[in-house]
Amino acid sequence: SADDLRIENNERLNKELADSDFVMFLAYDVGGSRYLKGRQNQFEFISNNARLMEYTFRALKDTNKPFIFVSSQMANLSFSPYGALKVVGEHYARALGGIIVKLWNVYGIETDMEKSHVITDFIRKARDTGVIDMITDGTESRQFLHAEDCSRCLLTLAEQYNTIPRDKELHIASGEWHTILEVAEIISGLFPGTKIQPADCKDDVQKNSLINPDPYIREIWDPIIPLKTGIERVRKDMELEN
């Protein structure tokens, strides 16, 4: 398909880039913890992302377009194949002079349930079954950021593209740690009577690696949507989808 970035010499990609003023490189084969746990060690997952990056970065080089490459805070986790792939992407982006950002657990409405992240997953479970059955014990902590805050940050960076220092770490994060159990409790409060069932196992995708985000980006941007408000918005958006 012409929409498949894993295809070499994709004519549609070349045309779209040629017609663009600026490129946000967010495309990736990725999903939530459940998806990564099952896929990130598989050949196809690694191949999908390696090819997607090679051909897209080559097209960016050929068209010489300004761009932001969206990496992940998991690029700092050496045990993660997904993180290692993002590190390769960062090297590509650096070689071409683009901006590199690291996202921290961005959430919003999702339509592909196979790849859904924890907040969407918990809302769907609470709404449809009245039970939030977790895949971990919920003690792991995350920094959650609403997609609207993330989008505002990316736009700000694009607008200031030429003045953003390339040697700074740009971590797009909320700055607030919350456990997965806290998220479940917020969501169960939106659906009275919902039961929370933690599992016995610990998180083995990020292994609860509490590396704090670099604060530099706060000089040009601040998130404004609190977690509870953001979760309520996602719930309303999911109701509208139905």
Regions found by a protein language model. Give the residues of each.
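C-terminal substrate-binding subdomain of Rossmann-fold SDR/epimerase-dehydratase oxidoreductases
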Residues: A126-N242
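Rossmann-fold cofactor-recognition segment
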Residues: S1-E11
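Conserved catalytic-core motifs of eukaryotic protein kinase domains, centered on the activation segment
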Residues: S33-N41, L77-P81, T111-D112
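Conserved Rossmann-fold NAD(P)-dependent oxidoreductase catalytic core, especially the SDR/UDP-sugar
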Residues: V23-F25, R51-A84, I99
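NAD(P)-dependent short-chain dehydrogenase/reductase
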Residues: F79-G83, V87-R142, A147-T156, I186-S188
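Conserved cofactor-binding/catalytic machinery of classical short-chain dehydrogenase/reductase
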Residues: N48-Y55, P66, V88-G89, H146-D149
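NAD(P)H-binding glycine-rich loop region in Rossmannoid oxidoreductase-like domains
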Residues: N10-N48
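Active-site loop/turn elements of alpha/beta-hydrolase fold enzymes
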Residues: A2, Y28, S72, L103-V106
